[in-house]
Amino acid sequence: MEDTVYKNLEDAAKLYGPSELADNPELRKEEVLSVLKKLDLESVKGSKCSSLSGGQKKKLTIAMEYITRPEILFMDEPDSGVDGSMVMEVMTTLREITDEGKILCVITHTPDRIRHLFDKVMVVGKSSEGCGRLCYFGSVDNALKVFAAQSLEEIVHKISGAENAALVDQYVQWFENERRGGHAG
C-alpha cells in the first residue's frame, strides 16, 4: 500500500529530522502542516504520491529534505521532470528557502534556467586526472568574465567532455592561484 504525501513527510520528519520532531508527535504534526503550506502541497496532502504531477513530486522531495532542518540542501537537477509552468514555482520556493539563510547546493547542466537562484556559483570540471576539480567559485557575473562566456550554459559546454580536460586544468590552476592571492570571486 502506497503512502500519502502527508505520511511521507511525517516519516521523513520522524526518521531524519531533529529529535524534537521524532519524539514529539504534536510538534511533528505542526511542522508537517507548516511545510505542506510552505511548499504549497496542502491540497494534495491526502493524495497518493503516484498521483502527483512531476512538479508536485519535486516539491515533495524538497519538502522531505527541508523538514529535516538541514543547514545545506543538496538539489540534483531541481528543474528536471518539471513542466514549464511549474519550474518557476519550484524555483521560487527554493529561493525563499535560501532567503531563510539555508545554503542551497544545486547540481545542474542548465544553469541559465535557474540563474536567479544563485548568489554564487561553483564550477567543477573533469581534469586530465579524470576527476572533478574546482575551477571557480564566486559571483555569477565574475564567472562569466573568467570563462569569457555569455551564459552559464556556455561555461558548462566549455568544461564538459574529455576533450576539454586540458582547458579544465588551466582553469583549476587559475583558480588555485587566485585563491592563494585572494582575488577569485
What spans do the regions from the language model cover?
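Helical segment within the ABC ATPase nucleotide-binding domain
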Residues: 87-100
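Topological signature of polytopic alpha-helical transporters
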Residues: 11, 16, 20-31, 45, ...
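Catalytic Walker B motif of ABC-type/P-loop ATPase nucleotide-binding domains
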Residues: 73-76
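Conserved ABC ATPase signature
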Residues: 48-52
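Conserved catalytic motifs of ABC-family nucleotide-binding domains
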Residues: 69
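H-loop/switch region of ABC-family ATPase nucleotide-binding domains
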Residues: 107-109
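ABC transporter NBD signature
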Residues: 4, 53
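ABC ATPase C-loop
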Residues: 65-66
